[in-house]
Curated annotation (Swiss-Prot):
There is a cross-link at A145-G147 (5-imidazolinone (Ala-Gly)). This is Histidine ammonia-lyase. Pfam families: Lyase_aromatic. Belongs to the PAL/histidase family. GO terms for molecular function: histidine ammonia-lyase activity. The gene is hutH. It is found in: Cytoplasm. One of its GO terms (biological process) is L-histidine catabolic process to glutamate and formate. Keywords: Cytoplasm, Histidine metabolism, Lyase. HAMAP family: His_ammonia_lyase. It catalyses: L-histidine = trans-urocanate + NH4(+).
Length: 515
């Protein structure tokens, strides 16, 4: 994969930038004008410390210990102790792509110049990112206020040569990983440990990763919905633009246009335009634009919130270098991320729910008109029977996972931090839902293409035919029972890679999250 260069202008990251970074291979360079501003901010912190006034997290303890004054000669120890004590996460390491996003977002937030850190701090974060030093960040342990303390402490531990990091496939001690990459750890100055730990970058990175994966998944679900509609010999009449314009919901209008484009020129559709005794299709076919459009609108709302948060200063206290002020606030509270993640969880779960119903229709011979469970010699062969059960199990699991996390606060830090967002779990579980729905869509993909094969020599539309042919390159027709999981994994891989969206061509305008 070719590595490209991305110049980071603090506070100016777009969704397109995040998409390119997440799915591509990019080295990040800091805009040249940023270094001087960061140096001025660090000098301002020195002046504030020199005045001797108590400033939270600079010369005081943290959380409930904020009233404890720290002597000037112990300020570096204070920052180091903060990092070490707060590195209390647990669980499996976060995925590398998520950790890379965390490094990018933390560098972006600090580089805006309102956290009082030296330019060397931001540069080391970017050097770690570019050299492939990936901190080991346990997935559990943050409540999303005061920021993502435990995850970011594990990231920051590597900055000071502690903790662990992956480097070139090996899990090493933090100092060893830095040394192997030709980097050196830093000694943190006043405010710098707190600036590294405070912030919403872990929950935001998890949410953005889930969002970008969900975008590809959403496109795949639109396409498999079209495949199923044609395999079940459904009608495209409910996609008439006049219906959707009258309702006025933007996502619904766009999704209806996608279905019209997907069905254009289908010989299967043409074969039952007349003398079809069915008056209306079931909701899972007929109401696809309404359901998918609502999901699209909410994914877009989440995207707007998350791009803002990706560029946010979510530190505390926030430093205003022009006036040498430190103002304590609550920008670390990740409620916007938590609610955005909850919206995503509901939307993606619904994408899977309606897809599972389409799949159930396909395997039901009375509903679809296709062979029972989409296999010849049914009875001797069980065909897609249990694959549909797997999809149903995952759709049901998603109903529990989609329960809002943001409404489930618990007080922490001796009731000083008495309302928290649960944003990190909120975002992390969206990734679980996305993965479940990938499998549901994968089984629908397999089933719909199997159904189309039974309708030969009639062919579906040109774009849908390309999607079917892509599957058949790796998964043959299901002529008799065989191990099913390998077929599911092959279909999942195509969905993860975005292959379905690439197949349909420019004639089908798949909706982007920027809409």
């Amino acid at each position: 994969m070719t590595t490209s260069i991305f110049t980071l202008t603090p506070g100016k990251i777009t969704l397109s930038d995040l998409r390119d970074f997440y799915f591509g291979q990019m080295d990040v360079r800091l805009d040249d004008g940023t270094f001087e501003a960061l140096q001025r901010a660090a000098e301002s912190v020195e002046r504030i410390v020199g005045r001797g006034e108590p400033v939270y997290g600079v010369n005081t303890g943290f959380g409930k210990l904020a009233k404890t004054r720290i002597p000037d000669d112990r300020l570096r120890d204070l920052q180091r102790n903060l990092v070490l004590s707060h590195a209390a996460g647990i669980g499996q390491p976060m995925p590398e792509r998520v950790v890379r996003l965390i490094l990018l977002l933390k560098a972006n937030g600090l580089a805006r110049g309102y956290s009082g850190v030296r330019p060397q701090i931001v540069q080391l974060l970017l050097d770690m990112l570019n050299q492939g030093v990936v901190p080991v960040i346990p997935e559990k342990g943050s409540v999303g206020a005061s920021g993502d303390l435990a995850p970011l402490a594990h990231m920051s531990a590597v900055v000071i040569g502690e903790g662990e990091a992956f480097y070139q496939g090996k899990r090493l001690k933090g100092d060893e990983a830095l040394k192997a990459a030709g980097l050196e750890p830093l000694v943190l100055g006043a405010k710098e440990g707190l600036a590294l730990l405070n912030g919403t970058q872990a929950s935001t990175a998890l949410a953005i990763a889930a969002l970008l994966d969900a975008e590809r998944l959403f496109h795949a679900a639109l396409i498999t919905g079209g495949l199923t509609l044609d395999a079940a010999r459904g009608t495209d009449a409910p996609f008439d633009p006049r219906l959707h314009e009258l309702r006025g919901q933007k996502g619904q209008i766009e999704c209806a246009a996608v279905y019209r484009a997907l069905m254009q020129g289908s010989a299967i559709r043409a074969s039952h335009l007349e003398d079809d005794e069915r008056v209306q299709d079931p909701y899972c076919l007929r109401c696809q634009p309404q359901v998918m459009g609502a999901c699209l609108d909410n994914l877009r709302q989440a995207a707007r919130v998350l791009v803002i948060e990706a560029n946010a200063v979510s530190d505390n206290p926030i430093h205003f270098p022009d006036t040498d002020e430190m103002i304590s606030g609550g920008n670390f509270h990740a409620e916007p991320v938590a609610i955005a993640a909850d919206l995503m969880a509901i939307a993606v779960s619904e994408v899977g729910a309606i897809a599972e119903r389409r799949l159930a229709l396909l395997v039901d011979a009375q509903m679809s008109g296709l062979p029972p469970f989409l296999v010849q010699d049914s009875g001797l062969n069980s065909g897609f029977m249990i694959a549909q059960v797997t999809a149903a199990a995952l759709a049901s699991e998603n109903k529990t996972l989609a329960h809002p996390a943001s409404v489930d606060s618990l007080p922490t830090s001796a009731n000083q931090e008495d309302h928290v967002s649960m944003a990190t779990f909120a975002a992390r579980r969206v990734g679980d839902i996305v993965d479940n729905v990938r499998t549901i869509i994968a089984v629908e993909y397999l089933a719909a293409v199997q159904g189309l094969d039974f309708l030969a020599p009639l062919e579906t539309s040109a774009p849908l035919l390309e999607v079917a042919k892509t599957l058949r390159k790796t998964v043959p027709f299901f002529a008799q029972d065989r191990l099913f999981t390998p077929d599911m994994e092959a279909a999942r891989a195509l969905i993860i890679d975005g292959a379905l969206g690439s197949c349909v061509g420019s004639g089908v305008a798949l909706p982007a999250l920027e809409g």
